[in-house]
Amino acid sequence: GIGSDGLVELGTESQKERYLPRMATGELRAAFAITEHEAGSDAGGIRTHARKEGSRYYLNGVKCYISGGSKAGLITVIARTNTGDTGKQFGVFLVEPDFPGFRIGEIYETMGTKGQPIAELVFEDCEVPEENLLGAEGDGWIAAMKILNNARPLVAARCVGACERLLEISIDWARNRKQFGKAIGEFQAIQFMIADMAMRTEAARWLTYKAAIDSDNGGAAPQTVSMAKLYASECLAFVADNAVQIQGGAGYISGNPVGRFFRDARITRIYEGTSEIQRLIIGRALTRH
């Protein structure tokens, strides 16, 4: 996942041996921290800074909206390593929650994804041993973009899975819910809604397969994974909205699973790169000379 990908891509054998086995068993949860209050889509604008003194780095700054941040046993942190506020000289650091100078800030109340805490992470001269630097000091920007690139097919796959379940629920409802003396699935309006839900889900599935296959075969082009992530997340928004609509008032009642899907779907167009950023990536790739 996104929390462990930097370790897999850049980690030394010693670093991997120290953390990956416990991640594989579920003993150790991981998180990825790049977003800041003034650096969301503009990831190059991050201000969290790493200062090296002797055999340690000292991190100062605040990361926000970090998925699983308050429960993680290891956090991959992107921090600026140059002395100024410009340029893209970043490092990737493995931070454990018991390192001196680290603390959990605000834990946010969110619209959806209630099972995943979203937290603010505060670094106040947080001491990080130099052996917890991933790669070289200047590797951070390229590493961060690669981590996000690798994560986007996973977001797309989650969206496709949610679409499939919503489609199943909607078909079952259409077959069994009766109005005007017959199942609502016999009405053309409902049939058209379900047809569009199924068509878009299938298209999202094959875009996701394409991104995953290319990634497995040595690396997908950024526009390919952006297409998969963008289309699948927007497909989920469409499918979730229609699933609520098909159930009418029942779909709006708390406790109904379609309502949870509807709330959870919203974040997929934001994290791992907003829909707007995905369109920028795709457009720039296609128009570049």
Q: Where in this protein do the model-derived segments appear?
A:
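Helix-loop "lid/cap" segments that line or gate small-molecule binding pockets
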Residues: 1-10
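Alpha-helical interface subdomain recognition
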Residues: 10-15, 22-26, 40-42, 52-57, ...
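Glycine-rich, charged/polar anion/phosphate-binding loops
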Residues: 16, 33-36, 46, 62-65, ...
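Short Gly/Pro-enriched turn/cap motifs at secondary-structure boundaries
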Residues: 23, 38-41, 65-68, 82-84, ...
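A short, Trp-centered hydrophobic/proline-enriched beta-strand micro-motif
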Residues: 26-34
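Conserved hydrophobic/aromatic beta-strand scaffold that supports enzyme active sites
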Residues: 31, 45-49, 56, 74-78, ...
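Flexible, small-/acidic-enriched active-site or ligand-binding loops
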Residues: 45, 98-127
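A short core secondary-structure module
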Residues: 56, 60-104
